[in-house]
């Protein structure tokens, strides 16, 4: 699956067409149904505006919100998104009460002069995800014939299909893979994600460093395994470093996280790193705590003595940060997935913040720094540096699967450049 060879919205003639765009408006709402973080809506605006500026007859937006499990639920209606979308777009938006059916088709077919229509939540229909729960809460599967019909009915709403929902690209849902139009192209958000991931996965500038943190080794085995074929240096930090330290160096880790399943694989991963000439960097000192709490008592431990019983490592120490910074400074391409400590607690955020500072400096010097979604994207947002890095991915699960070497159904479904 080549990432850099997909059709994008700029390659497509939109004049006089109904442009059906799969967006990701899965935004948080408060008790008053107000959007609390409009970032995802703002992210889709350039694609919508491009379609309007290039003569689209109508722009039809489809999205999911939350997990209604295949049945209508007013709590997950997309209607509260309308005022926020109108504000950001600077024009009126028509809300359709469903995402398929005669009433929706009539609204779409009457639309002209660049009218913008937002469809109701796709996941109110079990046919979007292919599964859901019934009224009693039992798991149910969608009927195959009905899924086909649902996809045909969505297809009726456009002449051109644009996918701008990278965060859902790893899901083979109807709106991602089932739209049967001759032209299926990436929107600007999707295009940027594909460009940057192509940069690291298909032709990285070397030396190439990957920083992997987070809790469990077993969750990241495929990721580590795939990246060991691509990187020059690998930093293992965060909770999963303790599984490496205990397994490889027999370091006492006290009550720190230990992943039994992951520990069995560690020697194989280290062998592969040696075989591929990949430099493995592990933390050498730790900020420790007497409990998992923001107000815990703190201490310091090195890997020489290990972590005493009754204490747990929640961050890496200054010597580790020096090693990480040196590796960052020596690299041209840096891919970061998973924090270096429990950054949610201020006492244990230093290692993550120092690593982030080194990454920002690298990006400012013109090197490529990519943050792979999820918790690490939250870190970049927490310290307000998203625009100081080359790319912060919007898709946690999707970026993880790409980096594991998997093909993403939503990307595979897009047309290739001729």
UniProtKB/Swiss-Prot annotation:
UniProt: CDP binding residues: 214, 219, 238, 338, 340, 343
Coiled coil region boundaries: none
Gene Ontology molecular function terms on file: ADP binding; ATP binding; metal ion binding; phosphoglycerate kinase activity
Binding residues for ATP: 215, 220, 239, 313, 344, 375-376
Record: residues binding (2R)-3-phosphoglycerate: 23-26, 39-40, 63-64, 66-67, 122-123, 170-171
Pathway linked to the protein: Carbohydrate degradation; glycolysis; pyruvate from D-glyceraldehyde 3-phosphate: step 2/5
Source superkingdom: Eukaryota
Broad enzyme group: transferase
InterPro entries: Phosphoglycerate_kinase (IPR001576), Phosphoglycerate_kinase_CS (IPR015911), Phosphoglycerate_kinase_N (IPR015824), Phosphoglycerate_kinase_sf (IPR036043)
GO process terms (BP): gluconeogenesis; glycolytic process
Keywords on record: ATP-binding, Cytoplasm, Glycolysis, Kinase, Magnesium, Metal-binding, Mitochondrion, Nucleotide-binding, Transferase
Keyword Magnesium part of the UniProt annotation: yes
CDD domains (UniProt xref): Phosphoglycerate_kinase
Matches recorded under SUPFAM superfamilies: Phosphoglycerate kinase
Catalytic activity: (2R)-3-phosphoglycerate + ATP = (2R)-3-phospho-glyceroyl phosphate + ADP
Cofactor entry: Mg(2+)
Binding positions for AMP per the UniProt entry: 215-216, 220, 239, 313, 344
A family per Pfam: PGK
Keyword Cell cycle: no
Subcellular location: Cytoplasm; Mitochondrion
Binding-site residues for Mg(2+), renumbered to this chain: 215, 219, 375
Annotated function: Catalyzes one of the two ATP producing reactions in the glycolytic pathway via the reversible conversion of 1,3-diphosphoglycerate to 3-phosphoglycerate. Both L- and D- forms of purine and pyrimidine nucleotides can be used as substrates, but the activity is much lower on pyrimidines. Negatively regulates the biosynthesis of acetyl-CoA from pyruvate in the mitochondrion.
Family statement drawn from the similarity comment of this UniProt entry: Belongs to the phosphoglycerate kinase family.
PANTHER family: PHOSPHOGLYCERATE KINASE
Name used for this protein in its record: Phosphoglycerate kinase
Native organism: Neurospora crassa (strain ATCC 24698 / 74-OR23-1A / CBS 708.71 / DSM 1257 / FGSC 987)
């Amino acid at each position: 699956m080549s990432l850099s060879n997909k059709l994008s919205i700029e390659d497509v003639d939109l004049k006089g067409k109904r442009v059906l765009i799969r967006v990701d408006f899965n935004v948080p709402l408060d008790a008053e149904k107000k959007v609390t973080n409009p970032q995802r809506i703002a992210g889709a605006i350039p694609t919508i505006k491009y379609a309007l500026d290039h003569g689209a007859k109508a722009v039809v937006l489809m999205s999911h919100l939350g997990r209604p499990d295949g049945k209508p639920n007013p709590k997950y209606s997309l209607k509260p998104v309308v005022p926020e979308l109108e504000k950001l777009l600077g024009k009126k938006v028509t809300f359709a009460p469903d995402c398929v059916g005669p009433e929706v088709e009539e609204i779409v077919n009457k639309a002209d002069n660049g009218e913008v229509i937002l469809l109701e939540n796709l996941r109110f229909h079990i046919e979007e995800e292919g599964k859901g729960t019934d009224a009693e809460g039992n798991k149910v599967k969608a009927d195959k014939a009905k899924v086909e019909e649902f996809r045909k009915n969505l297809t009726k709403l456009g002449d051109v299909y644009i996918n701008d929902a990278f965060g859902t690209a790893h899901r083979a849902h109807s709106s991602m893979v089932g739209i049967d139009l001759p032209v299926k192209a990436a929107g600007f958000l999707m295009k940027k994600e594909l460009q940057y991931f192509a940069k690291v996965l298909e032709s990285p500038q070397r030396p190439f460093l990957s920083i992997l943190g987070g809790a469990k080794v077993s969750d990241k085995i495929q990721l580590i395994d795939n990246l060991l074929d691509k990187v020059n240096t690998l930093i293992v930090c965060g909770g999963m470093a303790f599984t490496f330290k205990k397994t490889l160096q027999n370091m006492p880790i006290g009550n720190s996280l230990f992943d039994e399943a992951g520990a069995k694989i560690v020697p194989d991963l280290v062998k592969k790193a040696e075989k591929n000439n990949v430099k493995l960097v592990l933390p050498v000192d730790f900020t420790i705590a007497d409990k998992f709490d923001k107000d815990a008592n703190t201490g310091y431990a090195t890997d020489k003595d290990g972590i005493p019983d009754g204490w747990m490592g929640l961050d890496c120490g200054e010597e580790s940060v020096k090693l990480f910074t040196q590796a960052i400074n020596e690299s041209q391409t840096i891919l970061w997935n998973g924090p270096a400590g429990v950054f949610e607690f201020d006492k244990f955020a230093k290692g993550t913040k120092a690593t982030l500072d080194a990454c920002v400096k690298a990006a400012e010097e013109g090197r490529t720094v990519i943050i792979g979604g999820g918790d690490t994207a939250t870190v970049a947002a927490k310290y307000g540096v998203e625009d100081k890095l080359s790319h912060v991915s919007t898709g946690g699960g999707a970026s993880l699967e790409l980096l594991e070497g998997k093909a993403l159904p939503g990307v595979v479904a897009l047309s290739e450049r001729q």
